[in-house]
Design a protein with these regions (language model features):
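Conserved, function-defining micro-sites of small-solute handling proteins
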Residues: 1-187
Length: 187
């Protein structure tokens, strides 16, 4: 419910609200800023140089919460050291099926997936690009590879370069708006 997610965050024992991310300008910061703006919360961003230092400070009580990837948080979640409040993806994570999405928590339309992409230089010959795409599709569909990826917290999927370009074109305006509103710069 809306109240529980907001209450979980706003009832932190820390007098000054802050949250950790795995770095300035990362999807971790963007997802946090997107949510806190929608929730009407003023939360100070504490950027870390990666997930590990942010998680260390979360576990040590230096920050009250963090926005991180499922794969980075999964070991601590499995050990019961931290609690997942919500996932930012459009659907529940197969790895955390009991954890609601932000939309299910009362924030419809809030969605931000973290994804990884294989990239190559501009001007890559079409034949090389086609071979790379085919190889990547085969690797991602290989059951053994998929099992290994799932075991470390990934939800593997494949998208062609065309689909990836469409995704980037769709997400870029949202990211620009969040960056402008939260004064996120490339410093």
């Amino acid at each position: 419910s809306t109240g529980s997610t907001r209450t979980d965050i706003s009832s932190s024992k820390r007098p000054t609200q802050s949250y950790g991310s795995f770095g300035t300008g990362t999807t971790s910061q963007f997802a946090g800023e997107m949510f806190f703006h929608a929730a009407g919360l003023k939360i100070r961003h504490v950027p870390y140089k990666g997930s590990a230092p942010a998680m260390t400070d979360l576990l040590g009580g230096q920050i009250p919460f963090t926005v991180d990837t499922v794969s980075a948080a999964l070991p601590q979640l499995k050990d019961g050291k931290i609690k997942a409040i919500a996932v930012t993806s459009g659907k529940r994570s197969a790895l955390l099926p009991k954890v609601p999405t932000l939309a299910e928590s009362g924030y419809p339309g809030l969605e931000m997936d973290t994804w990884l992409a294989m990239v190559a230089p501009r001007g890559l010959p079409p034949a090389v690009k086609a071979r790379l795409e085919l190889a990547l599709a085969q690797v991602v569909s290989d059951p053994e590879t998929r099992d290994k990826m799932v075991a470390v917290g990934f939800e593997p999927s494949y998208a062609s370069s065309k689909v990836l370009a469409e995704l980037i074109d769709k997400e870029l305006p949202l990211m620009r708006a969040i960056a402008q509103r939260a004064a996120i710069t490339a410093d």
